[in-house]
Amino acid sequence: MHLPDGSVAHAIPQGPLAIFPGSFDPLHDGHRTLAAVVAWKFGRPVHFELSRTNVEKPELSDEVVNTRIEQFRGFAPIWVTQAAIFEAKSALFPGALFVVGFDTALRLLDAKYYADGAHRDASLQAIRERGCRFVVGGRIDSSSVFRTWENPGELFEVLTEADFRFDLSSTELRAKLC
């Protein structure tokens, strides 16, 4: 784990954590605000997680990883893992509350990311058995409608629009920077 002061720790802190996975390309105010809301609402420190591997993207180079880690200096701890899927993340961080956006939560349930529906169900059961849950931040869709889950189920906590709303995605921020 890379700490805000730039040092590195190798042990997972004691007590319940909130883990905020993402690519953080770039880390922006929406990430910071969502982390603050989760820390306040759930009473858990928020650590960020950057996986070198991703089911939809090429593996991150050392240079890219180091650049993304640097964004967290003076802000928050960040873990660098090889855990591309949440079942693997739950093995690394048992008991964690994973902080995800609406689109990531939908992908978590999408059968196309699993061999079949039974594998998806087994993966979600493994996450549940490790005591992990998800907190989901909603988002504004292309019609300017705030989207979040109405019936989240036992694995998910949903933040309302009053809890958290940030209207600019990382993709939109990257497009504005180019």
Regions found by a protein language model. Give the residues of each.
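Nucleotidyltransferase catalytic core that binds NTPs
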Residues: 1-178
